[in-house]
Amino acid sequence: LETYKVKSTKVKEIIIFGDGNHPIWKEANSLTNFSSPWNDQLVKKIEFKAIHNSEKIYFQFKVDDNQTFTYPSEDKNDSINNSDRVELFFRSDDSLNPYYCLEIDTSGRIMDFKAKPNKEFDFNWNWPSQEIEVKSTVHKNYFIVEIAISIQSLKDLKLLKNGLIETGIYRAKYNQQKDNSFLPTWITWVNPKTETPNFHISNSFGVLKLK
């Protein structure tokens, strides 16, 4: 499996603002090898970083984009599901039974759900709200999403084992078409080698290795 090494920091109190300016991000490894295996167009730069202390793991997406799209809908999940977003999926093993999904739009709204194989989704499940925090900022040519998740919640869900978290890292980019509709380009860290875009399979996951 593809591996990303999550460095540790001695900084104890870390407040995320979603602006990318906290000094801890300079300590983290940078992951930029994202692609859309189903699309010939060049993918604009996506930079993913993660770092942890004894209490929490912190994730950051910095995404080059000068035209972010948010789908207008009264229903939050319907809106996020059709908008520019970043995604983290976590599994305890490759059976995907279950796995947990966080899909976050450019304004920092979360669509979180528990899933089982064959896209069986439970939207009544939520990541415990006191164990996760999300902040974001949108700029002229890029947006940033930062996520803080408690180590304890990852252990409770059996997702952090022996310093490893099996993780999928994704992005949905919505592009305006000639008829003014918006269609997604599906972007992933690990190429699942499927004919059509599908992140909800075991081949789309890699490993975060906590140091």
For the regions a protein language model found, what residue spans apply to each?
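Structural preference for beta-rich elements and adjacent junctions enriched in aromatics
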Residues: 1-211
